[in-house]
C-alpha cells in the first residue's frame, strides 16, 4: 500500500500485520515530536528519490498503546522481558529523514531482525540511529548521515548490562558519515562489526569515529577515516572486558589515530562471509551508492 499522510502512515506501520508500505512525497507530522511505533513484519520504503519523513522519526519497539497501558510505560524494563510480542522483521529503506525532534530511527525493547538501508538521515534532535534495550540482529547499511552529533548509539546506559549482554549483534557497513561528529557507533555490551564506512569530517572539533564503552566487542575493518579527533576512543568506562580489533585494512588519512585497540575482538566471519571493498575506494563508492534515491522502488 502507498501512504501520503501522517495518519495513513501511522495506521499502516503500527500493527504487527505483514505489510509493504510505500511512502510517497513528503509526510509531515503536524507539530508533534512523537516517534511513530513500528510493528513487526513491515517493509517501509520510499518511492523514488524524494520520499521524506519531516519532523518525526520511527520507533522500532514494543512501545505501542496496548503495551503502555498494560505495563505503565515500563515494558522495556528487564522485569517484562518475554511478556509481550517483540517487534521483528522490519526493513526501513530509501527514505529521507529531516528535522526529527527526537531520534531519526530508534530500535529498542528486544526488537530483532531489522535492516536499515539506503536512507539519508539529516541532523535529528537526538540520535540518528540508536539501537538499545536488548535489541538484536540489526544491519545498518548504505546510509548517508548528515551533520548529526550523536550519530549512532549501541546500548544506552552502563546499567543496561543485564538486558544487553549477549544481544546487540549489529553490522554497520557502507555508511557515509558526512560532517558528523561522534558515535559511529558508540558501543556498550554489544558485538559490532564496523566495516567499509567513510568518516568524512576533517574540520569539526570534539570528534571521534568509534567510541568504546563498557564491555564493548568491536571488529573494525576496511573503513576510510578523514575525521578530526580520535579514531577509536575509550569513553572512560570500557573496563577490562572491552575489546576492539582495528584491522590493518582500515585507512586513516586524517585523525588523531587509534587510542584503543586490544586486537582480540570477535571474528565476524564466524557469523557470515563478506568481501571488503578497498578503503581508499570508499569516497567514490559511497558518493555514488549511499543514501536515499539510489535504489529504485
Where are these regions (language model features)?
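Right-handed parallel beta-helix/beta-solenoid
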Residues: 1-7
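Extracellular beta-strand-rich solenoid/capping regions of secreted or surface-exposed proteins
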Residues: 10-18, 27-43, 52-91, 99-110
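Short glycine/acidic-rich loop motifs that flank beta-strands on beta-rich extracellular proteins
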Residues: 12, 31-34, 49, 54-58, ...
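Right-handed parallel beta-helix
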Residues: 40-46, 68-71, 86-99, 111-125, ...
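Extracellular beta-rich repeat passengers
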Residues: 186-189, 193-297
Amino acid at each position: 500500500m502507498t501512504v501520503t499522510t501522517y495518519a495513513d502512515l501511522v495506521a499502516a506501520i503500527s500493527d504487527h500485520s505483514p505489510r509493504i508500505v510505500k511512502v510517497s512525497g513528503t509526510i509531515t507530522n503536524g507539530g508533534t515530536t512523537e516517534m511513530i511505533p513500528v510493528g513487526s513484519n513491515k517493509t517501509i520504503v520510499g518511492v523514488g528519490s524524494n520520499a521524506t519523513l519531516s519532523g518525526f522519526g520511527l520507533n522500532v519497539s514494543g512501545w505501542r498503546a496496548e503495551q503502555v497501558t498494560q505495563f505503565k510505560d515500563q515494558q522495556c524494563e528487564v522485569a517484562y522481558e518475554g511478556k509481550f510480542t517483540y517487534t521483528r522483521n522490519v526493513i526501513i529503506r530509501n527514505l529521507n529523514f529531516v528535522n526529527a525532534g527526537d531520534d531519526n530511527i530508534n530500535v529498542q525493547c528486544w526488537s530483532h531482525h531489522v535492516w536499515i538501508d539506503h536512507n539519508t538521515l539529516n541532523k535529528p534532535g537526538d540520535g540518528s540511529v540508536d539501537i538499545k534495550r536488548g535489541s538484536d540482529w540489526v544491519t545498518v547499511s548504505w546510509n548517508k548521515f548528515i551533520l548529526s552529533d550523536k550519530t549512532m548509539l549501541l546500548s544506552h546506559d552502563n546499567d543496561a548490562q543485564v538486558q544487553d549482554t549477549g544481544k546487540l549483534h549489529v553490522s554497520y557497513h557502507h555508511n557515509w558519515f558526512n560532517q558528523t561528529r561522534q558515535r559511529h557507533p558508540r558501543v556498550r555490551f554489544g558485538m559490532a562489526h564496523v566495516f567499509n564506512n567513510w568518516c568524512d569530517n576533517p574540520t569539526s572539533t570534539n570528534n571521534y569515529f568509534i567510541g568504546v564503552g563498557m564491555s564493548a566487542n568491536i571488529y573494525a575493518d576496511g573503513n576510510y577515516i578523514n575525521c578530526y579527533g580520535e579514531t577509536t576512543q575509550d569513553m572512560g568506562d570500557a573496563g577490562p572486558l572491552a575489546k576492539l580489533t582495528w584491522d590493518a585494512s582500515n585507512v586513516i588519512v586524517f585523525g588523531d589515530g587509534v587510542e584503543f585497540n586490544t586486537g582480540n575482538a570477535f571474528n565476524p566471519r564466524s557469523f557470515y562471509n563478506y568481501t571488503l571493498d578497498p578503503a581508499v575506494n570508499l569516497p567514490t563508492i559511497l558518493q555514488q551508492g549511499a543514501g536515499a534515491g539510489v535504489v529504485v522502488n
